[in-house]
Amino acid sequence: MNVIVANEAKSMLSELDIDIIKSVDGVHTADELVDMFKNFFYARMILDITAIENYNDITNLQKISMGLDADKIILVLPNNEISTSSSYLSK
């Protein structure tokens, strides 16, 4: 069972043919997402990074990777200059 956290990619993610146990829409802080899912069992989390408040600040992604099992997270990146830059992707 999978979890979807969506914002800008909501329409694309809603078309996936997967089992979903929880779906969260909107913008949340990294701390809110960690608190929401740290004791929640799921196979994979599909995370639209635009759902993370101030996602351009890499420390917010680091908070999520430290607070949740990063091996279970699939990131959906927007097609913009910042998130597709090599410096952003290398961090």
Predicted stretch roles:
Residues 1-90:
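Long, basic/Gly/Ser/Thr-rich N-terminal segments
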